[in-house]
């Protein structure tokens, strides 16, 4: 079943390549089949927000990826919630 989720990632997650890491990993998941769309961005409070839409299994894989993060990151916690599906989302991108 298709879902759309917002993930807020807290800890040392800015200035460590977190957004590029997420984009790279989503692109790898999407190589086999187009499974995820959405975006990733830094927030002013030092956290990172990921909006992702796709099948539940792909979202679960993404959550595990977010828990690990890139080598220089230190993920302290992740908040997630389901939000309304946006049928206009086609790609996954980094927002500045």
Swiss-Prot record:
It is an enzyme of class 3 (hydrolase). Keywords: Hydrolase. Its EC number is 3.6.1.7. It catalyses: an acyl phosphate + H2O = a carboxylate + phosphate + H(+). The keyword Hydrolase applies. Pfam families: Acylphosphatase (PF00708). Belongs to the acylphosphatase family. This is Acylphosphatase. It comes from Helicobacter hepaticus (strain ATCC 51449 / 3B1). The gene is acyP.
């Amino acid at each position: 079943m298709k879902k759309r989720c917002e993930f807020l990632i807290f800890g040392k997650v800015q200035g460590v390549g977190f957004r590029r890491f997420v984009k790279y990993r989503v692109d790898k998941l999407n190589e086999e089949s187009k499974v995820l769309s959405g975006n990733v961005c830094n927030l002013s409070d030092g956290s990172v927000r990921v909006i992702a839409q796709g099948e539940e299994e792909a979202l679960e894989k993404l959550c595990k990826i977010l828990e690990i993060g890139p080598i220089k990151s230190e993920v302290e916690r992740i908040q997630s919630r389901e939000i309304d599906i946006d049928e206009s989302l086609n790609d996954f991108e980094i927002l500045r």
